[in-house]
C-alpha cells in the first residue's frame, strides 16, 4: 500500500455531519458529488447484509495494484448512498468483474470508448425493487 493509499483509507472521526462531509471531499473520496459519511455503523450494516466481515477480498485491480476488501466496497457504497439490501448485488457484480479481468483492464486502459454493461435479472431484481 502506498502512502497515498494509506492516507485515502484512514478513518475520520467528527461529531459534525457537515464537517465529516467536507473531510470526505478533502480526502479525495468524492469527485464533488454529494456523499454520505461512511460512519462505522453504516459500513457494518452493509457488511452484515451480505454476511461479510470486512476482510474478504472482493476484487483485485491489478492494473492499479489495488485489492478491494469488502470493507472498502462497503465504505464506498455508503458514501454513494447505496441501501444495505443492494449491497449483496454490488459485491456479486464486482466478483463477476474479477472473473473478466482482461475486459476490465481493456475498458479502463483504452483510448477508445468501450464500456462495461451489466444486467440484473431474476428474483433479486424484484426483491430490491430494481427498475425494469
Which residues are covered by each model-predicted region?
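Alpha/propeptide regions of enzymes that mature by internal proteolysis
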Residues: 1-112, 116, 130-132
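Short, structured patches in soluble enzyme cores that scaffold and shape functional sites
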Residues: 120-124
Amino acid at each position: 500500500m502506498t502512502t497515498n493509499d494509506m492516507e485515502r483509507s484512514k478513518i475520520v472521526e467528527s461529531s459534525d455531519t457537515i464537517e465529516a462531509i467536507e473531510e470526505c471531499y478533502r480526502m479525495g473520496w468524492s469527485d464533488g458529488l454529494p456523499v454520505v459519511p461512511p460512519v462505522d455503523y453504516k459500513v457494518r450494516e452493509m457488511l452484515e447484509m451480505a454476511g461479510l466481515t470486512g476482510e474478504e477480498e472482493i476484487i483485485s485491480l491489478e492494473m492499479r495494484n489495488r485489492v478491494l476488501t469488502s470493507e472498502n466496497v462497503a465504505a464506498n457504497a455508503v458514501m454513494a448512498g447505496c441501501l444495505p439490501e443492494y449491497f449483496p448485488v454490488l459485491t456479486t457484480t464486482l466478483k463477476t468483474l474479477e472473473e473478466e479481468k482482461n475486459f476490465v483492464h481493456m475498458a479502463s486502459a483504452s483510448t477508445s470508448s468501450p464500456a462495461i454493461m451489466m444486467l440484473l435479472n431474476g428474483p433479486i431484481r424484484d426483491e430490491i425493487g430494481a427498475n425494469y
